[in-house]
């Protein structure tokens, strides 16, 4: 069953989403050469405390940290550690969430540590982020879940990969419903699987975390011995972007974007829903 939210509940999720946005801003500034991924976790904990918010990652299924810090070939669920020191040229994806009065926010971004990154890495992150926005733009009343998957996949497949070949759209992980829990039905693939059908129709009150994960090579992954860290099987580097989005009668509201998604959705000719906290 898909949890449909009231306008008041979406407003609470917007509060949680803005805390996530604040964590993103603080960790992005702190992700510099010489910092450890545990340093970034400490930054996130400080932001949560300042906003009287709870972490939704810490303790989830036994996860031992507040945020996920996934460096280079790590796709998702990297565990912050004092032993992982960021270096010039690294790429890091930071995934984090927050809870306000029982309502969840969840989002991720990819950042470049230092300078001197290969153009293929810059393009990988751009393609992944833009495919997320294509998916968000497809979150409109009357569409079905598969329309979001199709929008994400179509955008990625239309982008030429530097050096040839195709980007790997990660198969084993995807987006999800969000609300009173961080992960809820429905599961959202980042590609079209016709065996799954079209999925539910999108109606006001529908809330999703849309999160493409893309690699420079394989779509296949494996989990390391810590039972959390997910890496590409061929060692190619990856990118991960995510926003939590609510569908309202006035259109989509990107709960974890500071401006509610207004600027990016305008590029698609879409007006973002009014911010309930404005």
Model-predicted segments: where are they?
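Active-site neighborhoods and metal-handling regions in enzymes and metal-associated proteins
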Residues: 1-278
């Amino acid at each position: 069953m898909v949890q449909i939210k009231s306008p008041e509940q979406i407003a609470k999720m917007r509060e949680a989403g803005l805390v996530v946005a604040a964590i993103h801003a603080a960790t992005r500034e702190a992700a510099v050469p010489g910092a450890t991924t545990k340093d970034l976790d400490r930054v996130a904990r400080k932001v949560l405390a300042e906003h009287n918010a709870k972490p939704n990652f810490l303790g989830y299924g036994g996860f031992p940290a507040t945020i996920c810090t996934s460096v280079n070939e790590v796709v998702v669920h990297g565990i912050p550690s004092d032993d992982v020191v960021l270096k010039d040229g690294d790429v890091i994806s930071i995934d984090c969430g927050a809870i306000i009065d029982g309502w969840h926010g969840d989002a991720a971004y990819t950042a470049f540590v230092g300078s001197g990154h290969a153009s293929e890495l810059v393009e990988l992150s751009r393609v992944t982020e833009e495919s997320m926005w294509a998916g968000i733009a497809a979150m409109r009343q009357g569409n079905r879940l598969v329309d979001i998957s199709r929008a994400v996949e179509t955008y990625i497949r239309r982008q030429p990969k530097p050096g040839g070949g195709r980007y790997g759209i990660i198969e084993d992980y995807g987006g999800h419903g969000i609300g009173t829990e961080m992960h809820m039905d429905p599961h959202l693939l980042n590609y079209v699987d016709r065996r799954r059908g079209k999925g539910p129709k999108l109606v006001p009150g529908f809330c999703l975390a849309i999160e493409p994960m893309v690699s420079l090579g394989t779509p296949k992954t494996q989990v390391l011995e810590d039972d959390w860290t997910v890496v590409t099987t061929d060692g190619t580097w990856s990118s991960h972007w995510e926003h939590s989005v609510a569908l309202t009668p006035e259109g989509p509201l990107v709960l974890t974007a500071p401006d509610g998604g207004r600027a990016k959705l305008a590029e698609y000719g879409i007006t973002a829903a009014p911010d309930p906290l404005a």
